[in-house]
Design a protein with these regions (language model features):
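Conserved short "hinge" loops at termini or chain/domain junctions
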Residues: 1-77, 91-99, 103-188
Length: 188
């Protein structure tokens, strides 16, 4: 009798993960594989949506990736890589065993403490959020190639800058309350 096993389809391969993640070449990548599918589900799928995610997975599983979707995978890779390390880092530091949670140490190295892990995770998350914003900008600019992508906030694409016009309004840290604009008032 054959076992039913769930095999998630991840959007990036090991080469793309190594290329875009902050881990060193001598890191055992297989330890991050479980966190790859978790990060994909938690952070990438909400950005690209279920329909586009399913299309990418189907094309990856049948090895029929379109050039446009191949470009999208390359844009997804840095975001997914950073979020994967963000998700997996605590479990590289500590291990859950039958006797409890233990911190990994060896004769040649000493683990960092929980404060250091928290700081590293903060840096990883900050970088991942910037990369996620760049992914959304890419999807906005190339929207005609991704008809299955339906952003939850239609106004998000309004603020996307085109190359050479990356100007940003001044933010002083002082908040002046004004009426919220609904998406119906966005001009394209």
């Amino acid at each position: 009798m054959a076992k039913n096993t769930y095999q998630p389809i991840v959007l990036i391969n090991e080469a793309l993960f190594k290329l875009h993640s902050p881990v060193t070449d001598n890191t055992v990548i297989t330890e991050f594989i479980p966190y790859l599918s978790i990060a994909q589900e938690l952070y990438i799928e909400p950005i690209i949506g279920t329909a586009l995610s399913e299309e990418l997975k189907q094309q990856i599983s049948t090895n029929t990736l379109t050039p446009e979707n191949g470009d999208l995978i390359v844009k997804i890779a840095p975001v997914l890589s950073f979020y994967t390390v963000y998700q997996g880092l605590p479990f590289k530091w500590a291990t859950v065993l039958n006797k409890g949670v233990t911190v990994r140490e060896s004769e040649n190295s000493k683990s960092v403490d929980i404060k250091d892990i928290a700081q590293l995770r903060s840096w990883l998350k900050n970088d991942a959020e910037v990369l996620a914003s760049q992914l959304i900008d890419y999807l906005c600019k190339c929207r005609e190639h991704y008809p299955l992508w339906m952003p939850s906030d239609e106004c998000a694409c309004k603020n996307t800058y085109s190359e050479g016009s990356a100007t940003k309004k001044f933010e002083s840290g002082i908040f002046f309350k004004h009426k919220n604009k609904t998406c119906n008032t966005c001009k394209r």
